[in-house]
Amino acid sequence: MKLRKRLAALALAALTLLTCLTGCGSAGDDGDRLSLSVRVGDKPATYDPIYAEEIGDQTILNHLYENLMRLEKDENGQITAVSGAAKNVDVKENADGTVTYTFRLRGGKWSDGVEVKAGDFVYAWQRLADPATASVYAPLLSIVSGYEQARASGDMSLLAVSAKNSSTLTVTLDGHYDWFLREVCTSIATMPLRQDVVKRLKEAADAVNEVKPASDSSARWWSDPTMLVTNGPYTAETLTGSTLTLTENANYGKKITGPDELVFHFSDEQTGQILYAQELVDAVWPLSEEEMAARITADETWQADPVLETYAVLFNWSRLEEDGIRRALSLAIDRDAIAALAGITGKPAAGLVPPGVPEGEQDFRTSGGDLIDKTSEGYADRCTQAVRLMQEAGYDRGSDLGTLEYLYADEGTNGAVAEALCRMWRSVLGLNITPRGVTKAELMTALRSGSYTLAGMAVSAVCNDAECFLMDWTSGNSDNLLHYENSAFDTLMSIIAKAEEGSARMGCLHDAEDLLLEIDCALAPLYTAGTAWDLRETYMGGFRDPRGWFDFRGVYLRPVTVQ
């Protein structure tokens, strides 16, 4: 009875939204105009590219702005980087090992008719790199020459990004980093911004805040997306409490082959599923656990899209210096049991780099194989080995180590994972480890300061390349949350940075991951997970970027087959 009432209430909530919903996949009277309705998240937390962390926020910005390059799905279903705001790029290797990219812009315009200039990218990239903005995506630019000096001094002119003239942008990198065009130049966080527009909108927001009650949330320069000046294929036309409508940007300068109108719907996941089932939206993300389970039942070969992160236990090297203890902690983990807590798509981690990261035309994880013994059959033997390692380290009883603490961000399934880990460590090793849930901000503060012993964290990367999952762990790196130091690892990563794309580079990347996990046991990967979405069968052309956000600019009606 309670379930029926809840479903009825959800259905009623969905129907009350109907008055502000456009028709699903509606076409105009002439049949040529296409409106696509999409649900990919809750109400956006921000429309500022350097702060957008949610999939829905990033998806909207992906349609409002255009970067130097953009990703496109080709006829074979492969996602490749093509020209965006730049019409071409020249690459030159310098005598000192640095590499300079020279972009020539195509002469595109902002939505107010003003020309897109190289200086707009300089402003946006300097703003991203500036420690004062505290963007989590600043490391995207860590490969740009002068990045560390700019951040240390606060002088962003030291960042090697400059406008040679209004249509020519130059960027110098510290090494080859062949993923620069594919990953950095297509990222949401490196989208261009007009400094004069940001300044004007900030002043307007400040004026509003002066007369608003203190109890109200502060206005931001991006608070009203319909006031934004953007350079992508769409502009924000109408904002309501539950929808944002984008329409074609008349000044884009390229023909839009997809929808003339995109309507983004903001709702919780359950309501999103109802809207999709009732054909009130054409695309929905994410699919529920129940829906994914049903697909697996119907087709055992069905696979969720990989999420580019690995949940892992971080060991603070300044506190857990003994290799035997770290290795014992990792061996005592039943990864099958932990992965089951992550949901229907959870799988025991085989390494730090998750599935979905490319190695040429192959998958890096598949090519590298399992670096972690995660079989349930071998768990008893691993526990025996873990006990022996503790004894060899001089700890006959786990209690000899005293009481330890395991920190984690108190959200999602992290709490259940923490409790399970601490039970395993107590049962197998006799360790007294107390789990403590904190906010995500508190966790990051502890990790950066080194004031932790054990911590759980989703290890992700700002780019879809194996190097980006490994480069943070070099000695002295400000993002090295393990406080790990190994000169051999540093040397490998230095070689990788200067290597061109190819088998030699990939071999070094596999060696670096092996050194980090198998030889040093610097951290203990636990599990990876997946996600899934739906685009109604009447459509073709949309795709999910491996980094998470979606692209609907190429969606079109599936041709009708006449029999």
Describe the predicted segments one by one:
Residues 39-94, 229:
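N-terminal lobe/hinge region of extracytoplasmic solute-binding protein
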Residues 73, 177, 185-257, 261:
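Gly/Pro-rich hinge or "lid" segments in bacterial periplasmic/extracellular proteins
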Residues 339, 373-379, 432-443, 468-538, ...:
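Extracytoplasmic/peripheral linker and loop segments enriched in polar/acidic and small residues
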Residues 53, 87-140, 170, 321:
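Aromatic- and charge-enriched surface segment that lines or borders ligand/interaction sites
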Residues 242, 248-294:
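Ligand-site clamp/hinge motif
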Residues 535-563:
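Long beta-strand-rich cores associated with HINT superfamily self-processing modules
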Residues 120, 138-210:
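Surface-exposed binding/hinge segments that line
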Residues 346-392, 411-415:
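Structural transition elements
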